[in-house]
Amino acid sequence: MLEKALGPGSDLVEGRPGSGARSWIFQGTLWLILASTFTFTSMWLTHDPHALHSLASWGFVANADELASAGVYATLYGSVSMLVIGSGFHIIPKLAGTELASETNANLVSFVWTMSVLVLVIGSQNNMIFGIEIIPIGTAINAIALFAVILNQLLTVANRTRSMALPGWLILIALLSNPLLSVISIISGAVDDSVGQWLSYHLFGGAFFFAGVTGVALYASSIASGNPLWSKSLVGVTLFGSILTINPFGDNHGQMVMDVFGPLAENNVVAFSNQDMLAASFLMALAFIPIFAFASNMLVTMRGSDVFVDSPNYPGNAELNLGAWLIVPIAIGSLFVQTDTVSGTSELVGIADSLSVMSLWLIIVPLSLGAALSLYPELTGRHLFSNSRARWGYLMMTGGAISGLSITMIADFMDMALVEMMVEDPSALSEELRKVGSVMFYGVVIGSIFHSLNMVTGMFRGELISQKSVKSSSISVESYFLVSPMTVRRILASGASLDTEVYPTEEDNGKGSATSLEQLSESSIPPTKLYVRYKKEGKWTWRPADDTDIDKYMSEQGN
């Protein structure tokens, strides 16, 4: 029926190359606007609970915690997941040397995924409608869509014509980890235990979101910069570390797991035994190995490529650089907060929410959005509509997130200090700082709108790419001229590979002297070769001149 439809209806099932990836990425950018709006509104309602009181006449009572939950669902499942899955629909076929198994399936499933996120957002505001829990329904729809995505990617990998690079395996393992961890959590009873809920939340974050985001970011960093990945070993460390360690990013509780699994989970207070505390702290500290491996690999691969805003061929590099730089300091802060929760001290619980939002908008969103922007020209065949709008989008999102969340965290520290000193009256300065922080975070909303409009408009009005951009490393991949003693590590770090041919250049360390013109004429100027034109079998041809021909020529010139 859709094939016979006019306009967009037929486009959905036409199966054009790259249509599935484009559909996921464009919907992910639109979710970025809603995610930033929900997060900004929740921050504003924190210091002004009655700001949206007029909506009560329509039956909607705005609550800061509920809107914050909606912002998390829209950010993780609406924006980040769709950007990662959409980028994966382009990356895995490229690395496998084949085409996506079904572009039509990828295109249609994107709308099913969007519908599941809508249900999750609605459930975050009112989880019980007509006696039915809404969030588990959204989770079930999301699982069906993810199952279709996994089948599509597995069929694509099955038809590969060459071995797939490690970033592709990172994306594939991220997709497979979601249903596997869900089944394991249900069978083991982890969803019905407070510690199990906390553990499931962070395992989902590490295996699904961290692995998926790092996979697309590593691929995009190599494509955008034109440099090969600095170290394949570090990619392997990132791959195994995302599975075998506990990711410290995110909330310090398992409320999301409890909401997602609905009747299978009970509301429990997080309480760790001494053995659980030691194991969790050790595995979270161990997570710094893949985090450092990813950050160093990204930064070295992208060396000298942070000026994307002036070149339409390199969109997204600034976002990728931002995420790679900030992942380590935010991970350190998250480790302190999570360890504080695990140990039961709860002295840093006041900054947990701000740090969780910071990890979303300064690490996960920039990396996933930067990867999508880097793949944009190849997916659409056009440049972004406006480089200036891309530059302003980056500056507004980055400046708004850093300044707004940092100021909000300062207010959190002030409130924590007042609680510790048992001061009952709230601080007026803290309230003012929260107002300033929420106003600054509004820049993220504006930046999201800039990016989304720029990408959607660029698809129709962006400058056509006349020829494929030629990306090269700092040295030629085919050859490398060795002019001085150098280690193999330095040669490989410069962009060479195992197939690069190294040519040693001879050096003479003797004392230099002036070269005479006579010596130069004898040794440096190559001899001139003469040819004689003659007629052979009725056709004019050429042969090398011999001594007789030269003597004859010289005698004729003398006469």
What is each stretch, according to the model?
Residues 1-559:
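Hydrophobic alpha-helical transmembrane segments of multi-pass integral membrane proteins
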